[in-house]
């Protein structure tokens, strides 16, 4: 089979075919070549303006469904080589996970940021990476702790010690072991007396932290909102002090459903608010706590 000749040229006009146009392949081929030439021209112009890499691709929100275009391995190859060649903020793909908590469910993985943590940490992150945020909450609710305490800070919570590791294992399987561990500065102690930076009479605040191996984590307030709102002290932020580009470009992305495609649902954040509450993002977008 012969290939059509493709010339990078933008064609602004194309001869229309009529009922009297001979139905010969040459008539079709010449028009297809014009269309292919347009595509190539536009691609060439885009390549001139856009250099592959985290900086430029972080600046563009696309929101494209990659599920039936690339495999997980192909997506991760574009991440690990640092080009992010056909990956942009808001692009997403679906995976299926199975856990002892929620059984089988679909997770829509949204690209929220690229190379966010490069050179961060007490051990610097050296690998190219993409931050993935699920579009929706997992379908089964979970507590931060069994009682209304924040003892041990974020790291000491039941969410971190028991719940998140179960989902991390399931997601690691679904993502073909491509999730990388990074070091994150997370709260591990809370003073039960003294005013919280949350204000409004909240008592108790995070008063220590430690570098911790992290595979799966709740977001900080800054990663979601771009600023602290109810965080009890500077210990609640650590190195997680940059808003993900997903929420900068598309603030509506902070609203999540319960389970894949479910109705609106609030979700936990990592910040301690007081001796008895952690921060959350409400189903109505409100910065709140429980």
What is each residue range found by the language model?
Residues 1-47:
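Extracellular "spike/adhesin" assembly and maturation modules
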């Amino acid at each position: 089979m012969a290939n059509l000749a493709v010339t990078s040229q933008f064609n602004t006009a194309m001869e229309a075919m009529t009922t009297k146009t001979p139905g010969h392949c040459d008539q079709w081929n010449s028009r297809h070549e014009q269309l292919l030439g347009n595509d190539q021209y536009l691609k060439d112009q885009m390549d001139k303006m856009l250099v592959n890499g985290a900086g430029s691709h972080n600046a563009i929100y696309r929101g494209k469904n990659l599920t039936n275009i690339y495999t997980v391995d192909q997506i991760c190859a574009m991440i690990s080589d640092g080009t992010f060649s056909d990956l942009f903020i808001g692009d997403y793909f679906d995976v299926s996970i199975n856990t002892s908590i929620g059984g089988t469910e679909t997770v829509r993985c949204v690209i929220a940021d690229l190379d966010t943590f490069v050179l961060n940490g007490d051990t610097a992150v050296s690998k190219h990476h993409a931050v993935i945020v699920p579009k929706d909450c997992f379908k089964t609710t979970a507590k931060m702790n069994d009682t209304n305490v924040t003892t041990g800070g974020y790291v000491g919570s039941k969410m971190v010690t028991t719940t998140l590791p179960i989902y991390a294992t399931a997601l690691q399987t679904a993502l073909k072991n491509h999730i990388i561990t990074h070091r994150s500065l997370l709260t591990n102690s809370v003073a039960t007396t003294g005013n919280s930076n949350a204000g409004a009479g909240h008592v108790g605040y995070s008063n220590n932290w430690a570098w911790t191996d992290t595979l799966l984590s709740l977001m900080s307030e800054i990663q979601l909102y771009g600023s602290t709102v109810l965080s009890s002290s500077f210990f609640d932020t650590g190195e997680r002090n940059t808003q993900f580009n997903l929420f900068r470009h598309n603030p509506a992305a902070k609203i999540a459903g319960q389970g894949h495609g479910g109705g609106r649902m609030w979700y936990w954040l990592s910040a301690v608010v007081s001796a008895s509450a952690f921060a959350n993002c409400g189903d109505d977008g409100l910065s709140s706590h429980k």
